């Protein structure tokens, strides 16, 4: 029995014309997709997906499945939680870290001849670093009490203040002397006495002895001649001048003493205020030294 071959269905586009198969292939070549073009298109799709993933904001996932550190809360007990003091200069020197960024190898001064002023910023920087809190949730206890702010530096060279003349210091004293007392304390025809500026010498302020009057000598009337009366008038004028000068000096000293009493009370009040302020400063300094050590 002979096998019959079944005719295959042909695409009418591939049916060669009657005038030749070769000519039809040359005129209408068959275009098939190449393997390397498919691979190139797949690579481009992969790169596009990677670019999309890199541009999208994704949160990196950790491989650790336990609880994170920031989700925990530290147990804080005021009795057991204590801050220990650490010497920052020793810590930085052990780790080879310079105390301040200003101390580099390209410093214009040699290492042995550096000015003493360069040490001041480093100390202040270390003190500002020491005042920082050890934990972000616990603020530093001296953040409101420390007079030194972060980044604030003391002047390197402190100029010594010039001495003050005590005579130029004026204390506000509410003292207004009586004009009548000033008139009694001033010499007629001269400048008015000022108890604020007038100063007496040590000799003037010494106690004066009591002057006893001379014993009266009885002189009979027949001996009282013109020479006697002239001498008598002269002695009376001298005694009057002496009494007036002594009374004037006593009045001046009395007014001056009254002014000094008022000035003394004002100075005592000012000294009391200064001592109170000094006590507060000493307390703040003692608390600072207790936390951060002596300055």
Swiss-Prot record:
It is found in: Nucleus. One of its GO terms (molecular function) is DNA binding. Residues 37-70, 93-167 are annotated as: Disordered. Residues 225-288 form the bZIP domain. Keywords: Biological rhythms, Chromosomal rearrangement, DNA-binding, Nucleus, Proto-oncogene, Transcription, Transcription regulation. GO terms for biological process: positive regulation of transcription by RNA polymerase II; regulation of transcription by RNA polymerase II; rhythmic process; skeletal muscle cell differentiation. It comes from the Eukaryota. The keyword Transcription regulation applies. One of its GO terms (cellular component) is nucleoplasm. InterPro entries: bZIP, bZIP_sf, PAR_bZIP. Residues 227-247 are annotated as: Basic motif. Highly expressed in liver; lower levels in lung and kidney. Its main location: nucleus. Residues 37-52 have a biased composition (Basic and acidic residues). SUPFAM superfamilies: Leucine zipper domain. Residues 248-255 are annotated as: Leucine-zipper. It is linked to A chromosomal aberration involving HLF is a cause of pre-B-cell acute lymphoblastic leukemia (B-ALL). Translocation t(17;19)(q22;p13.3) with TCF3. Belongs to the bZIP family. PAR subfamily. This is Hepatic leukemia factor. The gene is HLF.
């Amino acid at each position: 029995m002979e096998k019959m071959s079944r005719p295959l269905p042909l695409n009418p586009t591939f049916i060669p014309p009657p005038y030749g198969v070769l000519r039809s292939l040359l005129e209408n070549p068959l275009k098939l997709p190449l393997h390397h073009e498919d691979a190139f298109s797949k690579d481009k799709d992969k790169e596009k997906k990677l670019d999309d993933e890199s541009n999208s904001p994704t949160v990196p996932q950790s491989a650790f499945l336990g609880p994170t550190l920031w989700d925990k809360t530290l147990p804080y007990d005021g009795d057991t939680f204590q801050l220990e003091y650490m010497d920052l200069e020793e810590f930085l020197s052990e780790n080879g870290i310079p105390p301040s960024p200003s101390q580099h190898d390209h410093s214009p001064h040699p290492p042995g001849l550096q000015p003493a002023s360069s040490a001041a910023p480093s100390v202040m920087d270390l003190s500002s670093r020491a005042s920082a809190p050890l934990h972000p949730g616990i603020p530093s206890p001296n953040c409101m009490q420390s007079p030194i702010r972060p980044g604030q530096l003391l002047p390197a060279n402190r100029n010594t203040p010039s001495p003050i003349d005590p005579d130029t210091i004026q204390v506000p004293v509410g003292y207004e002397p009586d004009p009548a007392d000033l008139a009694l304390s001033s010499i007629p025809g001269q400048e008015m006495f000022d108890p604020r500026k007038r100063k007496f010498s040590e000799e003037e302020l010494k106690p004066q002895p009591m002057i006893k009057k001379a014993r009266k000598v009885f002189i009979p009337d027949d001996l009282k001649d013109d020479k006697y009366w002239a001498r008598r008038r002269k002695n009376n004028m001298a005694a009057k001048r002496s009494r007036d000068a002594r009374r004037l000096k006593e009045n001046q000293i009395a007014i001056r003493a009254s002014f000094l009493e008022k000035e003394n009370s004002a100075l005592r009040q000012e000294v009391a205020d200064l001592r109170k302020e000094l006590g507060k400063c000493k307390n703040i300094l003692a608390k600072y030294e207790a936390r951060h050590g002596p300055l």
